[in-house]
């Protein structure tokens, strides 16, 4: 496999696991993230397996997104696969108690950031009439749960954007699909609960949550299908999870 893949949010969780698996399968990688130290470690870890280029920027900053992606070196500039993985949840509050800063962060990262990166990547895909965009959504984009309000709204937006992309880009032969995970044990809950490790740990206690590697396996499967096959929308949950609010736990 000699295709070039760009992965946002590559320094942890699903993004990191996807980078590791793609490297093993000989994809050239452009890895994006906000934490330079983690990007450096990842490049050192994976650089012996495949060519790696790292980009340190925040997807919320559209000028930085455009600048970094437009200035990719020639060996990495023709992106074949975009994995829009960067995303976060901030807070778990009823709507009347929600933080405006939390709302801004979720909309800016989960929705606008995805759009900024996609906009920067698309001209090349359109010109060559080929490419594959994987949008990492969530089961929160398929239903709404108590106190999930704005996070669920942001992931419903990802679901709508994914559908819209697939319609708009059909004439160019670009594949577009979403992978929508349920409960995956990552730094997600630590970020949502702002470093409250005890509260974050309770989210995954009493059942086997998905691992980042599980989602990476699925992403690899999606992007390695024959080109006439497009997996447009995929939902994956742990066996113990039936919905956002129904999880069989044995405590």
Question: Can you say where each PLM-predicted feature lies in the sequence?
Answer:
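Conserved glycine-rich Rossmann-like NAD(P)H-binding loop of the short-chain dehydrogenase/reductase
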Residues: 27-42
